[in-house]
């Protein structure tokens, strides 16, 4: 049984990447540079705009983050796809938090809008995930809407983020 806490530290998230947080069958988060959050500050099973669950996480920004040195030289900006990936990561993390087992795979997104950017001068990125639907049966899948904020301003929105958990990804 997964111990459900309402927040997780960077060390907890790194343990998830090693397969230690949710046990051998639970979905791991990416490790190293691809882990796009420093902490989960809130998780609820019945909160959010649809009362189906809510996750809020944060990433501390500093000019030394790996992507600023290569995207783009002379014009550093966090790639928008990394913010999108962070939202998918959090959907999968939530499914593991609920006790779902398998390897997480992004299955799609309805619509993504970018209305701002993350520059090296920013201090903090916040991710907010509002679940619309969660299926925990033979099929394990989450559908959610998400927002990315930089220093309190919404800069990306995504509707219908979909993540599934798969015990066998060979035929995926």
Swiss-Prot record:
Q: Which GO terms describe its cellular component?
A: cytoplasm
- Signal peptide coordinates: none
Reactions that this protein is recorded to catalyse: a (3R)-hydroxyacyl-[ACP] = a (2E)-enoyl-[ACP] + H2O; (3R)-hydroxydecanoyl-[ACP] = (2E)-decenoyl-[ACP] + H2O; (2E)-decenoyl-[ACP] = (3Z)-decenoyl-[ACP]
Query: What is the similarity comment for this entry?
Result: Belongs to the thioester dehydratase family. FabA subfamily.
Q: Name one GO biological process term.
A: unsaturated fatty acid biosynthetic process
Q: Which InterPro entries match?
A: FabA (IPR010083), FabA_FabZ (IPR013114), HotDog_dom_sf (IPR029069)
Q: What CDD domains does this protein's entry cite?
A: FabA
Q: Which residues are the active-site ones?
A: 71
Gene Ontology MF annotations? (3R)-hydroxyacyl-[acyl-carrier-protein] dehydratase activity; trans-2-decenoyl-acyl-carrier-protein isomerase activity
Q: EC?
A: 4.2.1.59, 5.3.3.14
Q: Which gene carries the instructions for this protein? A: fabA
Native source species: Serratia proteamaculans (strain 568)
Q: Where in the cell is it found?
A: Cytoplasm
Q: What is the role of this chain?
A: Necessary for the introduction of cis unsaturation into fatty acids. Catalyzes the dehydration of (3R)-3-hydroxydecanoyl-ACP to E-(2)-decenoyl-ACP and then its isomerization to Z-(3)-decenoyl-ACP. Can catalyze the dehydratase reaction for beta-hydroxyacyl-ACPs with saturated chain lengths up to 16:0, being most active on intermediate chain length.
Q: What SUPFAM superfamilies does UniProt report for this protein, alphabetically? A: Thioesterase/thiol ester dehydrase-isomerase (SSF54637)
Annotated metabolic or biological route of this protein: Lipid metabolism; fatty acid biosynthesis
Q: What's the protein here called?
A: 3-hydroxydecanoyl-[acyl-carrier-protein] dehydratase
Instruction: Note the subunit structure.
Output: Homodimer.
Q: Which Pfam families match?
A: FabA
Q: Which UniProt keywords apply?
A: Cytoplasm, Fatty acid biosynthesis, Fatty acid metabolism, Isomerase, Lipid biosynthesis, Lipid metabolism, Lyase
